[in-house]
């Protein structure tokens, strides 16, 4: 009998006096990113650039196309190769009416040092909160950005998404795609 009373007391403490299981609120799950597609409105962002400016996507709307080349991590081999490709061939990209950036979830200080080391003549954007990377669906399970490039038209809509970026030829590939997507050339 004594064991039955102890068991009943333990059960009451575990389930509460009313016999209901206590409910602890489940932690809020991060909203899963909807996969962006060609024709979708590109999510707006405001990110710090290595040029010391804040870059807001909507500021370019109606003025020029935008290319955002996401990369995993500053100072790593593939990212270094991609940055060098874009820096060494910037004159070809600048033949188009386009603002182009590399972007990562690295902090601004790391990206600034990386850009200076690789002599990048274009801004690298920092998204340390990972909010923009999440909105673009590029955040991988390790918390780094996937190497994807987004081509965004003057109207703010996505013209193309390159999910097979080749770091060594990224600049040449970017120029080819800008032509394919009908981005106007500068005069």
For each feature predicted by the language model, list its residue ranges.
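N-proximal helix/coil linker or "cap" segments that precede and/or mark the start of modular domains
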Residues: 18-44
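Positively charged n-region of N-terminal signal peptides that target proteins for export
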Residues: 1-4, 20
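Structural microenvironment flanking redox-active thiols in thiol-disulfide oxidoreductases
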Residues: 75, 80-118, 129-134
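A short beta-strand-turn-helix
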Residues: 36, 45-65
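Short active-site neighborhood of thiol/selenol oxidoreductases, capturing the structured segment around
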Residues: 59-80
